[in-house]
């Protein structure tokens, strides 16, 4: 079943325990051309996914360069229920953390099935709407958090967090939903599950990771034409030109930090990235670096394509 959320298309699939070859449930996404966000709420409002289901969803996102929005355990009724030793680590054990983010608490909104009665719901769908709106208005590189990240359609939250409660959760990599006077419910955090202070990961922030995923997917698809081209210096120069143009357009849109293109990004594809051994194996390697808007050193991503194949 498909639903529309703003300008975005949303596919709704049952979470199935079927095997991957059956292409049922979440495995149906193997046939999807492209998706960017994944929500896997439990079947029942008060239900909870198994850890295996969370791991499957996160692994799916890693394979497809997508991002998984994780719901909190419904038993977490106050901030003190969420500590590294008190359930959080077990809750996300084995989950690929860099492509996922956890949001707390649950949201309160009208249940159309119950005639509009206000009930508690997992927040993943509401957060996905905020992220999609932020992508449309500011780009994938903009943090989907802050006063502009209002959660439309939500009446309230199950827990009203204070600044003092927000801080420790943020340090654990848990993104808080907050309620502010005159603003209402908002997303007030933009860290991945790899964003705990103790981890010091380069993928600490949601917009940095999602920008990298966007670049990887766009450049992988945008350079597939090289497969039947001679794998030599003219091809590498053409790749640098095309990828450089793509990166420059993003720079002009404000995707990167830096006053000049040199400060904002680089593209490398030459005899250093693609050795003679790579050429012999039919591979071309592209290295891209970019300066994210969050203060950090250049983030490096690598794209590998098959090249130099003679068309039969």
PLM regions and their residue ranges:
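Long, low-complexity, polar/charged, intrinsically disordered or flexibly structured peripheral segments
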Residues: 1-22
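Structured, hydrophobic secondary-structure cores that serve as assembly/anchoring elements
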Residues: 24-312
